[in-house]
Amino acid sequence: MKILFVAAEGAPFSKTGGLGDVIGALPKSLVKAGHEVAVILPYYDMVEAKFGNQIEDVLHFEVSVGWRRQYCGIKKTVLNGVTFYFIDNQYYFFRGHVYGDFDDGERFAFFQLAAIEAMERIDFIPDLLHVHDYHTAMIPFLLKEKYCWIQAYEDIETVLTIHNLEFQGQFSEGMLGDLFGVGLERYADGTLRWNNCLNWMKAGILYANRVSTVSPSYAHEIMTSQFGCNLDQILKMESGKVSGIVNGIDADLYNPQTDALLDYHFNQEDLSGKAKNKAKLQERVGLPVRADVPLVGIVSRLTRQKGFDVVVESLHHILQEDVQIVLLGTGDPAFEGAFSWFAQIYPGKLSANITFDVKLAQEIYAACDLFLMPSRFEPCGLSQMMAMRYGTLPLVHEVGGLRDTVRAFNPIEGSGTGFSFDNLSPYWLNWTFQTALDLYRNHPDIWRNLQKQAMESDFSWDTACKSYLDLYHSLVN
């Protein structure tokens, strides 16, 4: 099968979050499964700086962006058997960052038009075209409404993956003519209109042949008013083509037996290296070096979406216990200040590292006993899977991908891979935390068994790839 991905970011070239991880890993797994895979990404200035000498020029042409003609260069490189094509236009993509400009609508309108017109020119007409989030969600609409006259594109099947429904691409309806060069008919009849705006995500949901999300629970949640971001009715209407597939993690990169960022390696049969990493981390962040105290890790953006309003409200209670917490992350200044204040009040119990450090993050995943992740909503989440890979048990709020990946501790069977609570409140966070502390202190054999189950969980991309192939084969025989 010929499969083409079109996305706004993709590791290792450009990455701001989970979308970049998916684009970096899923195509590689599909190639290993015997398929021909290509990816189209914007050619950002950070790509030029880091990978420019590995990328070759292929061709260039002009793209009509409304009444304007814009330069489009095509560049190319091959990595892990995947052919990466880049759309080059310095005016749109040399901004020093991926997102956040006032003209993001125009930037990604150009990108989508250029990606579609590039397919013929690079001679890669896919059987299946996989687009991601609102930045590329107009492509299924454009294929059926603007480029339907191109015979080579007639049989292309499309899949839209929603990584985060919060970001929908809502713009003035004038964009349809001014940038995309199409009429207002589909806006006037309500197909593309939502809240009196052009809504790219709605267009993708309606026009794509299949819609996927990054976990089964999130697929169900976005059909409710609580998580649907005002598109829940549209998703309910299209529910027959909506499904969820849990993201994977790179099992080779996140491997406690070989991780180059760790001082000591270990496996599920011998955790002595984990204990040494714990002592090393305690020393590094200025906490008393104690093997007996439970060490709790947090690696996250410090935002309300991640549940840190509830964590801050609970901290006084939690820190009355004989525990240590090491936090790594940046975000809302109010949360940054709160954690810094608590670190001063409880210097031997809380280390607040208001920054981001890849090596320190890896050490936290590997060295801690518990990993706290009480997200208000979480489409998939990767941190909890990374933590389990290293035998660090997650304590999570039961939403989205957290519900799908963390098996809550069952005290009757002594089974599970972590701890979870259903109601996001300080009371239930504290109650679940006490359950975990009791198990750690009084039932070490059961704790050890949970660690083993967590480390044996399969979150590899090869497993996720099989689910995506089932989805693709439902469209392409």
Curated annotation (Swiss-Prot):
Free-text function comment from the UniProt entry: Synthesizes alpha-1,4-glucan chains using ADP-glucose.
Disulfide bond sites: none
InterPro entries with a match to the protein in the record: Glyco_trans_1, GS/SS, Starch_synth_cat_dom
Pathway connected to this protein: Glycan biosynthesis; glycogen biosynthesis
Signal peptide: none
UniProt xrefs under SUPFAM superfamilies: UDP-Glycosyltransferase/glycogen phosphorylase
Enzyme Commission number: 2.4.1.21
Pfam families per record: Glyco_transf_5, Glycos_transf_1
Record-linked CDD domains: GT5_Glycogen_synthase_DULL1-like
An example molecular function term from Gene Ontology annotations: alpha-1,4-glucan glucosyltransferase (ADP-glucose donor) activity
Residues engaged in binding ADP-alpha-D-glucose: K15
Catalytically driven reaction(s): [(1->4)-alpha-D-glucosyl](n) + ADP-alpha-D-glucose = [(1->4)-alpha-D-glucosyl](n+1) + ADP + H(+)
Similarity annotation: Belongs to the glycosyltransferase 1 family. Bacterial/plant glycogen synthase subfamily.
TM regions (residue ranges): none
Gene behind the chain: glgA
Presence of the UniProt keyword Disulfide bond in the record: no
GO terms classed as biological process: glycogen biosynthetic process
Coiled-coil parts of chain: none
UniProt KW GTP-binding keyword: no
Top-rank EC class of the record's enzyme: transferase
Name of this protein: Glycogen synthase
UniProt keyword list: Glycogen biosynthesis, Glycosyltransferase, Transferase
